Amino acid sequence: MLFAALRDVQWRKRRLVIAIVSTGLVFAMTLVLTGLVNGFRVEAERTVDSMGVDAFVVKAGAAGPFLGSTPFAQIDLPQVARAPGVLAAAPLATAPSTIRQGTSARNVTAFGAPEHGPGMPRVSDGRAPSTPDEVAVSSTLGRNLGDDLQVGARTLRIVGIVPESTALAKIPNIFLTTEGLQQLAYNGQPTISSIGIDGMPRQLPDGYQTVNRADAVSDLMRPLKVAVDAITVVAVLLWIVAALIVGSVVYLSALERLRDFAVFKAIGVPTRSILAGLALQAVVVALLAAVVGGILSLLLAPLFPMTVVVPLSAFVALPAIATVIGLLASVAGLRRVVAIDPALAFGGP
């Protein structure tokens, strides 16, 4: 019966090719959406990792060192720096801002850190900013060293380029000195949003808490939660569409082969063997569609304006998910086969 199912696939190859390509495109879009969600996290992880700190010290109750921070005066910085387990401490600040590009404005995320860190990323070209009027920018902005950049109400000189530094769905990052960020966002007040530390403090002054890198990444991703949830819903709907495509093909195949199935039953072929052949047909279609989907996802990902990083686990899981979809999609056809009367084999044309 399995051989008969594969022969049927061969004879109906045109229809099945259309189903495989259609389902493969759905699988590809699902992989791209998975990569889009993963890309949000990868961006945040790259940003946090580039700062080169082991942990962040924030005010007690703050949700994180970036978007969930509670700004505070840096008067306690020396005390934190002397805490047991702290190798180095630096005042850090973060604020959303805009830059001017011709007649239009573009959102950026501004970070402030000392020139030599911790907290200042390495640049691929130029150097780190050393004065409040200098800035290092993401290479995604397409700016050159020596250009003037209007950030908010200030005009800064670009002295460094940070490779592919983005967060919050491809929003470019820019890096100033801590004093430069304070002038940009806090009217020059000695206010910071966190203290970046090397090492791990065993005791902190009252009113402060430690945030590890994983929680810092989550803080940077928090504004994207609604978008991630929406993308997840769309991905689930696409899985359902894939199952419907495969199911419709298998069901039509079952309807067209009713006489064949009746003959099989009449000559004593077990129903379970017939069902296995039909299920195999659905699984073959789904698995071939998974291969097509994996290839298409690699071609589609670069076309998206945001970072798309499809995790290896998604490619590994796709064949298993495709198999489950194939089996579920074959249910309608299986029920039709079970109901076939063997007497149909002896009926007229």
Curated annotation (Swiss-Prot):
Major location category of this protein: membrane
Transmembrane spans: 17-37, 230-250, 284-304, 308-328
Protein name, as recorded: Uncharacterized ABC transporter permease Rv2563
Membrane topology: Multi-pass membrane protein
InterPro entries, per the entry: ABC-4/HrtB_transporter, ABC3_permease_C, MacB_PCD
Any matching Pfam family: MacB_PCD
Keyword line: Cell membrane, Membrane, Transmembrane, Transmembrane helix, Transport
Protein family (similarity comment): Belongs to the ABC-4 integral membrane protein family.
One Gene Ontology cellular component: extracellular region
Region annotation (Disordered) ranges: 111-131
Subcellular location: Cell membrane
